[in-house]
A protein has these predicted regions:
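Hydrophobic, small-residue-rich alpha-helical packing segments that form membrane-like cores
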Residues: 1-99
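Divalent metal-coordination and catalytic microenvironments
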Residues: 25, 52, 86, 127, ...
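Predominantly late transmembrane helices and immediately cytosolic-facing juxtamembrane segments
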Residues: 29, 33, 106-178, 190, ...
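Alpha-helical transmembrane segments of polytopic integral membrane proteins
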Residues: 33-36, 45, 81, 90-91, ...
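Cytosolic juxtamembrane amphipathic/interface segments immediately preceding
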Residues: 46-55, 168-183, 225-230, 325-336
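Alpha-helical transmembrane segments and their helix-start/interface "positive-inside/aromatic belt" motifs
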Residues: 57-67, 127, 181-196
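Hydrophobic alpha-helical membrane-insertion segments
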Residues: 66-78, 190-209, 280, 298-302
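Aromatic-capped, Gly/Pro-kinked transmembrane alpha-helices
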Residues: 185, 205-243, 254-347
Length: 347
């Protein structure tokens, strides 16, 4: 979705806004990726958020870093006061799309607004499942193995330790006696650096990227008319990104904090649709059917009929067969001749 913003910004001629979002996106997306790695490290390589929960108390530095990244990617901010990085760059793109005055620009504006809602929902879903709620760690096979190994050998699990004295008491709260630890400083320092960019990069650089033609020094086409139109869009356009962000946040909070039974109930009502999206539109299955299986079939045909049936048969295997057959005949004649010679000498 973030790359989509950059493309349709360039499509309406807002090249500065596209580059600005590329710039801010580098901070918060890298921050979220590295933050996810820190969480996976703490959870003994478990990557399924359904087996996380309540981690903010155990890995607080990672939590605050990922919170900064989430606030940036969802575009949290107060108009005219301060906002995180994505607040400035994403809003600039939506304003440019609306201000372009074209039908495609209007379509891009509404599609971008809907994408912002989805981004907000899945980003806050990630945060709520990972850092809030009750621990669901013991449901993870990775955590079960870590607990079993630590209990059996008495050593520390990767990124955590096992509390054997309270293991039985902990099973009821979903931890299984597993205690995640914060990542080492070598992983936390990059999170801190990227957090600064996720928080301040938009506020510091938005005028340079959007309003300052001298900043680009002719590197991109600068449309002053479009920039002027961006500043003149209605207030509701400027507030659209914030409103859809709040809607996405509210839906995620309702489903994953307020009433955690909502996702399961929803899946029961739309099971075919859920399976379609859960299986990634069955893209892997279609790709396997259309490309992989035919490629393997052709490969087997070339191997069986071409390589084995022709090349090997009339090549090395055929020559070998001829030599072996000739050798067997010669060997038989020599053996027969030696037998007659031996018999004659005996006589």
């Amino acid at each position: 979705s973030q790359l989509g913003y950059m493309f349709f910004a360039a499509g309406v001629g807002a090249y500065g806004a596209a580059m600005f979002h590329l710039f801010t996106h580098a901070f918060f997306k890298a921050l979220l990726f590295l933050g996810a790695g820190s969480v996976i490290h703490a959870m003994h390589h478990e990557q399924d958020m359904r087996y996380y929960g309540n981690l903010r108390k155990h890995i607080p530095l990672t939590f605050w870093a990922m919170l900064a990244g989430t606030l940036a990617i969802t575009g949290v901010g107060i108009l005219g006061v301060f906002g995180f990085a994505g607040f400035y760059s994403k809003d600039s793109i939506l304003e440019a799309a609306f201000a372009s005055g074209t039908e495609m620009g209007q379509a891009a504006f509404w599609i971008g607004a809907f994408a912002a809602l989805l981004t907000s929902f899945y980003s806050w879903r990630l945060m709520f499942l990972t850092f809030w709620g009750k621990p669901r760690w013991i449901q993870s096979e990775h955590i079960q193995h870590a607990v079993h190994d630590a209990h059996g050998h008495g050593d520390h699990a990767h990124g955590a330790h096992y509390d054997g004295d309270h293991a039985h008491d902990s099973h009821g709260d979903g931890t299984g006696g597993y205690h995640p630890h914060e990542s080492p400083w070598t992983m936390l320092v990059p999170l801190g650096v990227l957090s600064l960019g996720a928080v301040f990069a938009g506020f510091v650089f938005h005028h340079s990227f959007i309003d300052d033609a001298a900043f680009w020094n002719g590197a991109i086409a600068y449309d002053e008319h479009l920039i002027h139109a961006m500043h003149g869009v209605p207030l509701w356009v400027k507030l659209t990104a914030t409103c859809v962000m709040l809607i996405g946040l509210a839906i995620a909070w309702l489903a994953y904090i307020k009433d955690t039974t909502i996702p399961a109930k929803t899946v029961e009502q739309i099971t075919p649709i859920y399976r379609f999206f859960y299986n990634k539109w069955y893209f892997d299955e279609l790709y396997n059917l259309i490309f992989i299986k035919p490629a393997f079939w052709f490969g087997r045909q070339f191997w069986q009929r071409g390589d084995v049936g022709i090349i090997d048969r009339f090549g090395p295997n055929g020559v070998q067969h001829i030599l072996v057959s000739a050798g067997d005949g010669t060997h038989g004649q020599l053996r027969s001749s030696r037998s007659r010679t031996f018999a004659a000498s005996e006589v």
